[in-house]
C-alpha cells in the first residue's frame, strides 16, 4: 500500500531524475552546439577564381577553415566565408568551388548543408568536411572527408581538404547551379 510519504518520495525522485535529464540536455547543447560564423571575405576582389566556404563555429572547424583560407589567399583566390545556416540564401553560381564544413547532428548531416547539396545534384565543385563523434559519417555522393574533430589532426585534415579543393580548382570553371525543381 502506498502511503503519502512513499508517494512523496517517489515523486521527488522522479522530479530529480527529470531535472537531471534537462540539466544534461542543457550541458550537452552548451558543450557541443556550433557557434555561428560571421560572414567575411578575403583575397583579391578581382581574382580569377572564387571559393565559397560554408562552415560552423568550433575550435576545430575554425582552425581547418583558417588553413584553407590561408592556402587560397596565398594563391590569390577570392574567398567568401558564410555560416552553414546561410546556405539556403547563397547563390553558388559565381563560385568555382564550394567547401562545406559541417557537423552531424542527431545522426544526420546538418540540415542546411544537406538541403544545399540536395539542391545541387552536380556536386563536382563541392568538397565537404563532415565531423561526427566517431569521425565516420559522410554525406553520400560528394567528395570529402570525415573527422572526429581531433585537434591534433586538424592540420592533416585541412591538408586533405585542400588537396581535394586544389583538384576541383585545377579542373577549371563549370557552372554550379541548383536543380530545376
Show where each model-derived region lies.
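Solvent-exposed, acidic/flexible segments
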Residues: 54-65, 92, 106-110, 151-158
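Structural motif
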Residues: 97-99
Amino acid at each position: 500500500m502506498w502511503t503519502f510519504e512513499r508517494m512523496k518520495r517517489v515523486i521527488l525522485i522522479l522530479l530529480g531524475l527529470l531535472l537531471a535529464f534537462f540539466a544534461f540536455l542543457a550541458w550537452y547543447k552548451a558543450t557541443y552546439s556550433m557557434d555561428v560564423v560571421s560572414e567575411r571575405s578575403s583575397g583579391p576582389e578581382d581574382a580569377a577564381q572564387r571559393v565559397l566556404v560554408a562552415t560552423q563555429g568550433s575550435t576545430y572547424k575554425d582552425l581547418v577553415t583558417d588553413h584553407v583560407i590561408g592556402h587560397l589567399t596565398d594563391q590569390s583566390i577570392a574567398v567568401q566565408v558564410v555560416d552553414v545556416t546561410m546556405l539556403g540564401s547563397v547563390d553558388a553560381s559565381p563560385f568555382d568551388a564550394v567547401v562545406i564544413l559541417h557537423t552531424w547532428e542527431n545522426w544526420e548531416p546538418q540540415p542546411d548543408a544537406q538541403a544545399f547539396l540536395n539542391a545541387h545534384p552536380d556536386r563536382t565543385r563541392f568538397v565537404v568536411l563532415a565531423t561526427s563523434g566517431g569521425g565516420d559519417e559522410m554525406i553520400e555522393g560528394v567528395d570529402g572527408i570525415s573527422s572526429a574533430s581531433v585537434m591534433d589532426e586538424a592540420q592533416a585534415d585541412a591538408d586533405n581538404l585542400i588537396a581535394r579543393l586544389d583538384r576541383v580548382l585545377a579542373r577549371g570553371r563549370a557552372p554550379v547551379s541548383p536543380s530545376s525543381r
